[in-house]
Amino acid sequence: MSAVTVTREEPRARGQLAGYAMVLVAATLFGVNGSVAKVALSSGLSSLRLSEARCAGACVGLMLIVLVRSPSALRLRRHELLRLAVFGLFGVALVQLFYFLAIHRLAIGIALLIQYLGPLLVAIYARAFGHERVRRRIWAALALSLTGLALMVELWRGVALDGLGVAFALISAVVFAAYLLLAEYEVQYRDSVSLMAWGFFFATLFWTFAQPWWSFPAGRVAHTVSLQGRLAGWHLPVWALVLWVVVLGSIVPFSLIVAALRHVSATRVGIAAMLEPVVATIVAWAWLRETLSPVQLAGAGVVLAAILLAQTAR
């Protein structure tokens, strides 16, 4: 009997391991993407326009991938239309919109810390409405990860917080939680690539109305910019940086996150995704020469410990 149980548990354990690997790769790519985007924004391209280009480029890329691989996967049933539109709006477009609005009024670290309340909201939702048993280790991992993020942004330094900025960041946390929960539901009915293709399609529609594409400052992407920091002697055209943001900063990591939800719960995916600010901070220090104190390094270690703790809660 025990041998049969072990045999059945092995595929599940392998699936969870694969799921965590997908999230960690995605979080790493998102973290690197922060520095790439910062260099792209130094060209004068606004953060909202970069987000618009990110969504449109990812939409085109993902649609082409699905059309080549399995055109039938793009079939859209009438009863899916509203669900996918909501996913594209809340799960893709609004996460970026409210995050960018928040960082106009708050330090990036503070905004990111508030946004990563999202996994805590997922855990609360799972416990209160999803009738999902959330293990004590998961709650401990959430507390540990938020503590680590607080250390990384050195929250105790007495920063005066802008009320509207905090409100935007809190909305960003809510829509980030919605993204995880909506994606966890939708992957039961379609593959991760076609799901993200439709998600970015509806996000692109949103940006088309919010910022018409015909007013996009296309001339800016032809400019060449310095890579700054330790790579200041190197220059790349802005379009190459935008291409990175689209492919390795959007298509690949978003698809990996959604694919991981087939194997790992949204709560645990959210915790593992907290690797993003750790990677973002380290890359910015190594590349852009942004300062990194011993306390921030300790905070990064605490977040990594939280991710490992969540992984052990089976």
Model-derived features: where do they sit?
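Juxtamembrane helix-entry segments on the extracytoplasmic side of multipass membrane proteins
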Residues: 14-19, 44-52, 76-82, 154-175, ...
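C-terminal-most transmembrane helix of multi-pass membrane proteins
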Residues: 2-12, 55, 154-155, 238-240, ...
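Specific transmembrane alpha-helical segments of multi-pass solute transporters/efflux pumps
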Residues: 29, 34, 63-111, 115, ...
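Hydrophobic transmembrane alpha-helices of multi-pass small-molecule transport proteins
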Residues: 62, 125, 134-155, 173, ...
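Transmembrane alpha-helices of multi-pass small-molecule transport proteins
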Residues: 2, 21, 42-94, 121-125, ...
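Helix-helix packing/entry segments at the starts of transmembrane helices
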Residues: 52-53, 96, 110-117, 182-205, ...
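Glycine-/small-residue-enriched transmembrane alpha-helix faces in small-molecule transporters
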Residues: 2-53, 158-185, 206-209
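Hydrophobic/aromatic residues within transmembrane alpha-helices
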Residues: 40, 50, 54, 102, ...
